[in-house]
């Protein structure tokens, strides 16, 4: 179920402070965060945010189409290595 509109979007305080500080300074440095639950707001447009996936930080460049989504949606946590080919010769041995 989506979040209520009267509550507004959730963004961690430390993340919004970093974004606002960079907007005032006019810099576009990479912002490292562990907050996958934070929603992308219009103030983040044009910034690169490194989102933690449990192992490393994956850089995510925020575009206009991402507004309203959560940061964790753009940082996959699971790696798919593919299915093993069905090799009949190796099964006989």
Swiss-Prot record:
BP term (GO), one: ribosomal small subunit assembly
UniProt keyword annotations, A-Z: Ribonucleoprotein, Ribosomal protein, RNA-binding, rRNA-binding
The encoding gene: rpsS
Organism lineage: Bacteria, Bacillati, Actinomycetota, Actinomycetes, Kitasatosporales
GO-annotated molecular function: rRNA binding; structural constituent of ribosome
Protein name: Small ribosomal subunit protein uS19
Domain of life: Bacteria
Pfam families associated with the record: Ribosomal_S19 (PF00203)
A GO cellular component annotation in the UniProt record: cytoplasm
Alphabetical list of HAMAP family matching this protein: Ribosomal_uS19 (MF_00531)
Chain intervals with Basic and acidic residues compositional bias: 83-93
Region (Disordered): 73-93
Keyword Membrane belongs to the record: no
